[in-house]
Amino acid sequence: MSNPVQSDKDRVVIFDTTLRDGEQCPGATMTFEEKLNIAAMLDDMGVDIIEAGFPIASDGDFEAVNEIAKRSKNAVICGLSRAGAKDIDRCAEAIRPAKRGRIHTFLSTSPVHMKYKLQMDPQQVFELVISSVTRARNHTDDVEWSSEDGTRTEFDFLCRCVEAAIKAGASTINIPDTVGYAVPEEYYDLFKRVRETVPNSDKAVFSVHCHNDLGMAVANSMAGVRAGARQIECTINGIGERAGNAALEEVVMAMRVRNDKLPFWNKIDTTQLTHASKVVSAATSFPVQYNKAIVGRNAFAHESGIHQDGMLKNAQTYEIMLPETVGVKQTSLVMGKHSGRHAFIHKLEEMGHKLSSNQVEDAFVRFKALADRKKQIYDEDIEALIDEGMVSAHDRIKLLSLSVIAGTRGPQRATMKLDIDGVTRIEESEGNGPVDAVFNCIKSLVPHEAKLELYQVHAVTEGTDAQAEVSVRLSQDGRSMTARAADPDTLVASAKAYLGALNKLVMKRQRDVAPGHGASAAAAS
């Protein structure tokens, strides 16, 4: 949160690009509803700027950015655009409903990008910088210009482009480490030199956008801020292209915990960080690694006897921040089959979930069903239950029942009943193992050519009655979708996860085809 002692010149603007750069991570595509939910969450937690998508990329992206712009409360809603007129105009149309909108236009400036990607010479690129920013500025006063592959751009040319972009009306200048090549000292020097060299640098806010290919995205981001940048572009959980982006939770807490060395502040409500991490993880079906800084399951866990002894005497011996500051509770209320609706609603609110009355009722019904099968229900069980409900609410293919016969002899056999666009279908299939039989059953019921890229299982909680959480990734025609599902029965969880990914593929293809040419769920190939 903001520190009243520190001045506005020390304030760092948080620019979240989870919905744009984060979604570009292979397999991390989110549904329309998931994007709206995440945007509202980011707005509530104090994110200054939400980059909601790339409007020209698809009708689905345009619709998501446009709807987020309509619903925004406090955050600036930003759309990404290439340097072409068509891109910029489409972006402007998408963000128009926002109380405050921004066009973020970019152009490659490094020699390798200009030669092989753009096939343009430096003068052509320079002129396009001016024309693109000028066109964007005609739509809105808030224009950000990015020099793609800025850290590999020749310094003099970079300064020339930055000066021209500011002169054309850009109010924010982003110099990204697009390929995660820079080291902190180098990135610090780059920002320092550019700000000292460009004569009109004081007329724009400088921004950092760091990728994590060498594991230095957060360190580079903080180096840029120390050199005068006042905007950090980041994502929840650090998701993004290739090795990802700087993680929002890490840059925010670095400034808060080490304010002695990083005397800057931001407006983020840090108590919402853990919840935000779980929401994004559920939407993308990308598990958060256990040892992930700030929001990982083990971030505040201590197993070593020496560490435990120190913690019991004084938590500060091994913890540099209080768990509560990032939304981690010290104790969890264990719920079970005797818990009522009121206690369940209280637990949802305590965990940070804001659901409609219909969503609460649906979740409570599934909670009671789970409680009949499991002795104790932990917070992690409820998170998995809510995640599954949010994802499956609009599924066209739904699991009604599953029966599997398995043993040491002969092929395993699965019998499955599905609801496909309102029509009930039943199929029986064999396989080399129970999971193979289940997936073969789905392929018989819903013919498709999707390739299974990932099948992963882990326990949500401890104990023999723990829920199994299964992750499945399917790819087809250049599209890759991941889904997760949890159930005390591993085979049921496997079927739900596979169907979840298949539903996402169907929905994605629907959005990609021309209006009036809907895709059939029963013929996903």
Swiss-Prot record:
It is found in: Cytoplasm. This is 2-isopropylmalate synthase. The keyword Lipid metabolism does not apply. Its cofactor is Mn(2+). Keywords: Amino-acid biosynthesis, Branched-chain amino acid biosynthesis, Cytoplasm, Leucine biosynthesis, Manganese, Metal-binding, Transferase. It comes from Bradyrhizobium sp. (strain ORS 278). Gene3D superfamilies: 1.10.238.260, 3.30.160.270, Aldolase class I. Belongs to the alpha-IPM synthase/homocitrate synthase family. LeuA type 1 subfamily. SUPFAM superfamilies: 2-isopropylmalate synthase LeuA, allosteric (dimerisation) domain, Aldolase.
